[in-house]
Amino acid sequence: MTHHDCAHCSSDACATEMLNLAEANSIETAWHRYEKQQPQCGFGSAGLCCRICLKGPCRIDPFGEGPKYGVCGADRDTIVARHLVRMIAAGTAAHSEHGRHIALAMQHISQGELHDYSIRDEAKLYAIAKTLGVATEGRGLLAIVGDLAAITLGDFQNQDYDKPCAWLAASLTPRRVKRLGDLGLLPHNIDASVAQTMSRTHVGCDADPTNLILGGLRVAMADLDGSMLATELSDALFGTPQPVVSAANLGVMKRGAVNIAVNGHNPMLSDIICDVAADLRDEAIAAGAAEGINIIGICCTGHEVMMRHGVPLATNYLSQELPILTGALEAMVVDVQCIMPSLPRIAECFHTQIITTDKHNKISGATHVPFDEHKAVETAKTIIRMAIAAFGRRDPNRVAIPAFKQKSIVGFSAEAVVAALAKVNADDPLKPLVDNVVNGNIQGIVLFVGCNTTKVQQDSAYVDLAKSLAKRNVLVLATGCAAGAFAKAGLMTSEATTQYAGEGLKGVLSAIGTAAGLGGPLPLVMHMGSCVDNSRAVALATALANKLGVDLSDLPLVASAPECMSEKALAIGSWAVTIGLPTHVGSVPPVIGSQIVTKLVTETAKDLVGGYFIVDTDPKSAGDKLYAAIQERRAGLGL
């Protein structure tokens, strides 16, 4: 293996330590593989390589000196547009499949099945029923669950093009629903939206880049619908998150425990594993693990159990291979999405078991344990016992757990934020937030979303941008691997607020934190959950917009994805634009091969839907542009 300089791979000290260990042991990681891919294809990076039919692949010369059309006659604008919207559709399919899984579980529960699950948050269930117009008076709980499941599954089944998805219609501001409805951007059916996107991008179909991009925005709104229903139903099923103190980074692993990582996105299994682990503690101790069982999280599954159970977060997407390198990981249990196929190859060098659980997501070299919700506890016990058995194969001489970890205050659901505000004003909880936006103590709000990528130093842009905006009194929210970056860097603490927040923001967070009984300020970055939980920020923003009597596109609210990587992130960014948010991406999407498409998403979209993309790889200038967008919105509100 070629020597690799690990110093600039990640801003996370734990990651650097483990990468040096990988280097010393000739173990290949994502950073090594990225280096071997250089130089990456310029045609693909610009979106100018088309592989849609077997006459290709066709490449368009970005400089205009070579081919201008594919064999079928598609020009650069069509090629770029249809590949972009296909990526958005794939992201939508991933998030909505997650949501479908939860909705089907709710349906089974309403029918008296799935005895290992129950409705843990009845108050949230009744709140959802009110939102969706389901009668509750004098009705049994399971009947209400059944109606909610039916309405939700209807968003995957409805064939009436004039009837928008129920969750979107009920959850957005009336002005946004009307605006998007008039533009034809409200999907009627999640599955149909994905299917239609694939159909219209088949060879010989839609060749109008503007029409294609509008179709992309429509399917992105289906992604928001799928995320909304996944988040809300998960809260009813597993509990709505409330603030909890946890910890983050590889130092959360324990030498004297059976360490089990849950990695992926769906809480159906990981939540049960957290419940069952306590029951098998004595078995772990009997096997020699004096500290019992230690569950740790990776990626969005990690955030699901972190905010509901206080489970510590080991790391985010790009460094998911590194917990194996500690020599102290007994098992990594994975379900769906963002799971590296390299994991079993690295695990072969250690005692770690990589356990896949979803029949649609298997990995060569991993051990597959099929997960059946009807036997959830039994499956969880099987997996945990596999990890306990692996503990006996651990080589103590190879254990190298980094000492570094950070305290993290997490679990700020929309309900938790409102509850904290209610400590200041019980009669009108949103008033303190509105008042402080109006008086300028809070200039605006930024939502950090998205992934990690090897194209930049891991986590660095997140941290730099958040500090820059917080200093200018911008309230910072985060989900997914963005939240993981902040947790690992210690920005989800009261101490970070004291150190980095501007005076206005610091005063607000201190007042609310003290009133809420935290004994100090709210954390600098507020953890809202996993990637589907971006819908929590939308719920909070919608409540704020409705209170002010404005649309979402009027609010001083922006989004940022400094390390945008996955197709899901493109879907998230696209619906953020569609609901009216200026949205920054720090990885250049494959659109620069088309001036028309680039202008559509960065300029024309602003006139059409209110939101637009800001593409900037430099955190400093990106922060300036986001802050300028916030100031433009404030001016529009007369602030």
UniProtKB/Swiss-Prot annotation:
Compartment annotation: Cytoplasm; Cell inner membrane
Keywords assigned by UniProt, alphabetized: 4Fe-4S, Cell inner membrane, Cell membrane, Cytoplasm, Iron, Iron-sulfur, Membrane, Metal-binding, Nickel, Oxidoreductase
CDD domains cross-referenced by the UniProt entry: CODH (cd01915)
One Pfam family matching this protein: Prismane
Keyword Disulfide bond annotated: no
Entry's Gene Ontology molecular function annotations: 3 iron, 4 sulfur cluster binding; 4 iron, 4 sulfur cluster binding; anaerobic carbon-monoxide dehydrogenase activity; ferrous iron binding; hydroxylamine reductase activity; nickel cation binding; oxidoreductase activity; peroxidase activity
Highest taxon of the lineage: Bacteria
Binding site for [4Fe-4S] cluster 1: 41, 49
Biological process per Gene Ontology, one example term: response to hydrogen peroxide
Domain remark in the UniProt entry: Cluster B is an all-cysteinyl-liganded 4Fe-4S cluster; cluster C is a mixed Ni-Fe-S cluster which is the active site of CO oxidation. Cluster D is also an all-cysteinyl-liganded 4Fe-4S cluster that bridges the two subunits of the CODH dimer.
Extra remark beyond the main annotation: Methyl viologen can act as acceptor. Inactivated by O(2).
Family: Belongs to the Ni-containing carbon monoxide dehydrogenase family.
Subunit structure: Homodimer.
Protein name (Swiss-Prot/TrEMBL): Carbon monoxide dehydrogenase
